């Protein structure tokens, strides 16, 4: 799966400007989400502080100049940070894996919303 993630990230990178903070957040998401889907929440539990730090850095970073949808990206980044912080609190409170599952899915969906918005202004959907 590491190779698949690597190749997928290369395809995404080829389509749009590099955004280091997006890549760093994605790395943690990809390394923790798939194991959680299979019922193993240990990776995200051990890396949630790192994920929160990366989410805040992602929100505070400069959106690449050629991206359109900047307002929508900013709004979604705020949501990502809010959801990551809430997820961290839930993990720290000792919530069951079952209780964490839906929150992690929502966080994953929010990240993919951001990825979908990250297009150069001259790229059009057909």
Where are these regions (language model features)?
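Bacterial Sec-dependent N-terminal signal peptides
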Residues: 1-17
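Mature extracytoplasmic or organellar-lumen-exposed domains after removal of signal/transit peptides
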Residues: 16-126
